Swiss-Prot record:
GO terms for molecular function: ATP binding; glutamate-tRNA ligase activity; tRNA binding; zinc ion binding. It comes from Tropheryma whipplei (strain Twist) (Whipple's bacillus). Signal peptide: none annotated. The gene is gltX. This is Glutamate--tRNA ligase. A motif ('HIGH' region) lies at residues 12-22. GO terms for cellular component: cytosol. Monomer. ATP binds at K258.
């Protein structure tokens, strides 16, 4: 059902290269927004100055653009609820903090980590329980004395002593029964923490649905508590719906985190995965279009997607399956699109721009390569023979096989037209005069022409390479 009031957000921190789990989260949010005709908001959570990297910020923007996950509000686009970099929203956070303090929903806390641990030990309370709400009732006189002594407070939110429950769009009912201590909203420097800025930005930007990784589930009760406080002070009038997407597991059944090389988005882009294949596979990490079908387009996903169909169990990343799905989408491209996407990989491989003639040769070979590869880098290696002057071949052959090749050369030199059908007929005719398996001779010729055991079809490769280059390569192979 379409509902333009739906607003979701993708709000990564620019602390490293984008990883696949992050891209999967962006995809599910984008599809959810497009399904409902709502808004997809892109926000950069760059409040932690010690970890932020400008390069990472650019990579996040470039990643979404390359994937075609366009945003309705955010960096490079703006919107009525900006700015969309948290580092530029400090005045908003301070205004909210002032209102929370004035309403006695938050308070100043001066306790140090060491003081909290000491009190817990003296009270026989486990240290891991953390803060003990000690500063809730500090008098103004005590606070003044603390400041006089040079101590700077942090701001904490008052938590009610009650269970927090909500209906998760993926996991169903979730209930938190353990008491949650009053948690920090700021550092002692006054810098706002994630616990404050994330829900505040969602409230100001009128986010209706929060779809994010399951690793953030534990922070949800604190955010719900803050939302209720924001309702009290008039910042918003609702708590958004939450849906926690399953964890993605990698090799060895370990969580696929940003520290794993196999999770780096740029690894897949550089290897020649295409956006259609990568998005298709990432959508399968927690969701499927049907029990009998794994491949589909982005538009088909939008039509079929229901967040309540997302599975709650951990999803396992399978590189081989990702390759197979990418191969399917490579085959689905029209030939010209395949050619255009292949050109940058070929130029990077060769280290030089392709000439007009080289591009024509590449375009001609593409129909014979497209169905044989899983990655654009594989395709680039497969067509290298067309675009270089010399190839290296080290392969042992018998004297009889050399005789066959010489006979092939003699007949090929007599051809009037250099076309694949005539080339094939000529070579087969030469082989028939010798008691050898055609497959073996074809393999030798393939190596002589392309330098590879796996290549585009032999006779079409020879036609596109051209008479002179093809005959020279066979001659070189025979004489060396």
């Amino acid at each position: 059902m379409r509902d333009p009031r739906v607003r979701v957000r993708f709000c990564p921190s620019p602390t490293g290269a984008p990883h696949l789990g992050l891209v999967r989260t962006a995809l599910f949010n984008w599809v959810f927004a497009r399904k409902h005709g709502g808004g997809f908001i892109f926000r950069i959570e760059d409040t932690d100055a010690t970890r932020n990297r400008e390069e990472s910020c650019s990579q996040l923007i470039d990643t979404l653009k390359w994937l075609g996950l366009d945003w309705d509000e955010g960096p490079d686009k703006g919107g009525q609820f900006g700015p969309y970099y948290q580092s530029q929203r400090g005045d908003i956070y301070q205004e909210v903090l002032d209102k929370l303090l004035a309403a006695d929903l938050a308070y100043e806390s001066f306790s140090t980590k060491e003081e909290i641990e000491k009190r817990n030990l003296e009270a026989g309370r486990p240290i891991q329980l953390g803060y003990d709400n000690y500063d809730r009732t500090l008098s103004e006189q005590t606070k003044a004395a603390m400041r006089e002594a040079g101590r700077t407070p942090i701001i904490r939110l008052r938590m009610d002593d009650e269970n927090i429950a909500f209906e998760d769009l993926v996991k169903g009912e979730v209930v938190f029964t353990d008491p949650i201590p009053d948690f920090a909203l700021t550092r002692a420097s006054g810098e706002p923490l994630y616990t404050l800025v994330n829900p505040v930005d969602d409230a100001f930007m009128k986010i209706t649905h929060v779809l994010r990784g399951e690793d953030l589930l534990s922070s949800t009760p604190r955010q719900i508590a803050l939302y209720k406080a924001l309702i009290t002070i008039g910042i918003t009038d609702y708590v958004p719906f939450f849906g926690h997407l399953p964890i993605v597991m990698g090799e060895g059944n370990r969580k696929l985190s940003k520290r794993n090389p196999e999770s780096d988005f740029y690894f897949y882009k550089a290897r020649g995965f295409i956006r259609e294949g990568l998005l298709n596979y990432l959508s399968l990490l927690g969701w499927s279009i049907s029990n009998s079908r794994d491949t589909f387009s982005l538009s088909e996903m939008i039509h079929a997607f229901d967040v309540r169909d997302v599975r709650g169990n951990p999803a396992r990343f399978d590189y081989k399956k990702c390759l197979a799905i990418n191969a399917y989408h490579l085959r689905e491209l029209n030939v010209e699109d395949f050619f255009l996407r292949l050109v940058p990989f070929v130029e990077e491989m060769l280290g030089i721009p392709l000439s007009f003639e080289q591009k024509n040769s590449l375009r001609a070979i593409c129909p014979f390569v497209q169905g044989r590869v899983q990655l654009l880098t594989e395709a680039a290696e497969m067509v290298r023979f067309l675009l270089v002057d010399n190839i290296s071949v080290d392969f042992a052959v018998t004297d009889k096989e050399i005789d066959v090749l010489r006979h092939c050369l003699a007949l090929l030199n007599l051809l009037d037209t250099w076309e694949s059908a005539q080339i094939a007929s000529c070579i087969k005719q030469a082989i028939e005069q010798f008691d050898l398996q055609p497959k073996r001779i074809f393999s030798i010729l393939r190596l002589a022409i392309t330098g590879r055991r796996v290549s585009p079809p032999l006779f079409e490769s020879m036609q596109i390479l051209g008479r002179s280059a093809s005959l020279n390569r066979v001659e070189t192979f025979v004489t060396n």
